[in-house]
Amino acid sequence: SRSMAPSMKAFFNAVHEVADDPSSIPARQVMLSEAESLTQSFNTMNGRFEQIRDQVNVDMGGMVNDLNSYAKEIAQLNVKIVADIGRAKGEQLPNQLLDQRDNLLNKMAKLIDVSVVEQKDGSISVFIGKGQSLVLSDYAATLSIKNSEYDPTHKEIFMDGQNISNQLSGGSLYGSLRFRDEVLDPSQRQLGLLATGLVT
């Protein structure tokens, strides 16, 4: 709101000039001009908030796509690892496949907190949030990003049709959700309240 300060100061100075000399036409013209300038400043600032929101939505969509890709690859690797361990009768581990899977888990963990449970057959189960199953053996759930039913400008994270946004924690995806909910939304609301207060 630092860029709003000069416009607001100029507007209030012009208001004081009119209050001091209500009959002055030049003072009234200056006040109207400053009011228009202030309105433009509000619109510019609101436009910046919308640009940031659009970018956050794009970023979240990209992260959801990445998570889906990692989950599918992990499920496919689970199948190969179980088959290889079965063929080797447990005497030799498919280290290259295990390394690939670990690498995918590390990438996934940068985006969202994950819990991993190793199964006896060599496969792993991957859980996110408050215990939602993202990968179970050869099955990978699908994450999606959809408009909130309460606010179409808000994107929410769904897993197999269920909204899990408020159950996630950690990582870049959760960070984007928190930034939107705890920084962007309140700032834009404050701007709106300020504009409304000036109008009324």
Residue ranges of predicted features:
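Structural signature of extracellular appendage/secretion-system components
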Residues: 1-200
